[in-house]
Swiss-Prot record:
The lineage of its organism: Bacteria, Pseudomonadati, Pseudomonadota, Gammaproteobacteria, Vibrionales. GO terms for cellular component: cytoplasm; membrane. It is an enzyme of class 2 (transferase). It comes from the Bacteria. This is Bifunctional protein GlmU. Its main location: cytoplasm. It comes from Vibrio vulnificus (strain YJ016). Its cofactor is Mg(2+). GO terms for biological process: cell morphogenesis; cell wall organization; lipid A biosynthetic process; peptidoglycan biosynthetic process; regulation of cell shape; UDP-N-acetylglucosamine biosynthetic process. It holds the Pfam family Hexapep_2. Homotrimer. Mg(2+) binds at residues 102, 224.
Length: 453
């Protein structure tokens, strides 16, 4: 279906009390306006015209990679004026969909229904019925058809009783919309050019206006303050949690789970409370994620357990691994099958071989570790000299004792043993024992100093 979209995003967002443009505030980890852009892109919009005003530099920096045409509304003179700034780019025969950057949850299904419902030469309008319509423009009907929209400040007492309200979302043909926009005036209580006045213009020409309801009322709720943003965040997360539960993922408490990206799960996945998923995450069969974990852009294979309060970003974890608690896997970390990393272990740009373990208080950076190797508590790969990074290579079946410092670049061959407390600066041959611990001394009869009175 051939259509282009106009997204209105020029508002300042005064009630957000922020230096950031309102539409850049995030919902589920990405700016509100990006949710709208992504929905349009997914539906195949030919063009996406983004009307901006306040915080233009911030907007363009944050959305630099988005496929939008930037349209400046230098003065905020109303919604009609905003759409009119983009109208020179409208094709006469294309459908124009008007959306809002602070209404992030509108669904593809609702938009498709609206596009399908547009009558020839007329307007398809998205409306919703509210128990308390205060503050919204009212839908005025005459013997059934929609004939006008009256804003709250311009409504008379009878019109204020109407519960069907305008969401602002509409579809019209480009040539018709340009003509109606050209005829707008600002003779109203707010002194603005209302987009809603095109409804009356279409009716006066004898063109039909078709009202469509959204799949869910939450879709058309806008954000004017942080409380409303928090409400939409919880609504979005509840919907994501419901989908995962229906797909067989066991969320121990759906109300305490945040999905801020995409999650692919195998069978019998279990996710405990307060877990945050960001970016693209893949979990294999029988994976268990403990409470308080943060997973970002990572892949975790079958039968792996991630214990509580672990952070995994840009890493791959093999089958039957154990991670955590309190582990940090940074970008480039790779755990091969049946490997273990435990509490307060940090791994960055390092591969831990099959069956190897680093169970306590360890930093492994820029390292390659073979199979069945044990890394003792307190071991550090000293990979950075203040200017450059260097690699540590540890072979198969190596035992590294506690509190060892491995000063890269250094290689430890298969079967070697590094004694506890060693500072290693030279390569170790296969099967060697290396220890650099200072000689132990015992002093008999020694007494502790006594504080002077």
């Amino acid at each position: 279906m051939k259509f282009s979209a106009v997204i209105l995003a020029a508002g300042k967002g005064t009630r957000m009390y922020s230096n950031m443009p309102k539409v850049l505030h995030t919902l589920a980890g990405k700016p509100m306006v990006k949710h709208v852009i992504d929905t349009c892109t997914g539906l195949g919009a030919q063009n996406i015209h983004l009307v901006y005003g306040h915080g233009g530099d911030q907007m363009q920096a944050a959305l630099a990679e988005e496929p939008v045409n930037w349209v400046l509304q230098a003065e905020q003179l109303g919604t009609g004026h905003a759409v009119d700034q983009a109208s020179p780019q409208f094709e006469d025969d294309e459908k124009i969909l008007v959306l809002y950057g602070d209404v992030p949850l509108i669904s593809s299904e609702t938009i498709e229904s609206l596009l399908d419902a547009q009558p020839k030469g007329g307007i398809a309008l998205l409306t919703v019925v509210l128990d308390n319509p205060t503050g919204y423009g009212r839908i005025v009907r005459k013997n059934g058809p929609v004939v006008a929209i009256v804003e709250q400040k311009d409504a008379n007492e009878e019109q204020k009783l109407i519960k069907e309200i305008n969401t602002g979302v509409m579809v019209a043909t480009g040539g018709d919309l340009k003509r109606w926009l050209a005829g707008l005036n600002n003779d109203n209580a707010q002194g603005e050019y209302y987009l809603t006045d095109v409804i009356a213009a279409a009716h006066d020409e004898g063109n039909a206006v078709e009202a469509v309801h959204p799949v869910s009322p939450i879709e058309v709720e806008g954000v004017n303050d942080r409380a409303q943003l928090a409400r939409l965040e919880r609504a979005f997360q509840a919907a994501q949690a419901k989908k995962l539960l229906e797909q067989g993922v066991m969320l121990r408490d759906p109300a305490r789970f945040d999905l801020r990206g995409e999650l692919q799960c195998g069978l019998d996945v279990e996710i405990d409370v307060n877990v945050i998923i960001e970016g693209n995450v893949s979990l294999g069969d029988n994976v268990v994620i403990g409470a308080g974990c943060v997973l970002k852009d990572c892949e975790i294979d079958d039968n792996t357990i991630v214990r509580p309060y672990s952070v995994i970003e840009g890493a791959t974890v093999g089958e039957q691994c154990t991670v955590g608690p309190f582990t940090r896997l940074r970008p480039g970390a790779e755990m091969r099958n049946d490997s273990h990393v435990g509490n307060f272990v940090e791994v960055k740009n390092a591969c831990i071989g099959e069956g190897s373990k680093a169970n306590h208080l360890t930093y492994l950076g820029d390292a390659e570790i073979g199979q069945r190797t044990n890394i003792g508590a307190g071991t550090i790969t000293c990979n950075y000299d203040g200017a450059n990074k260097f690699k540590t290579i540890i072979g198969n079946d190596v035992f590294v004792g506690s509190d060892s410092q491995l000063v890269a670049p250094v290689t430890i061959a298969d079967g070697a043993t590094i004694g506890a407390g060693t500072t290693l600066t030279k390569d170790v041959a296969e099967g060697e024992l290396v220890i650099t611990r200072a000689k132990e001394r015992k002093i008999t009869g020694w007494q502790r100093p006594v504080k002077k009175k």
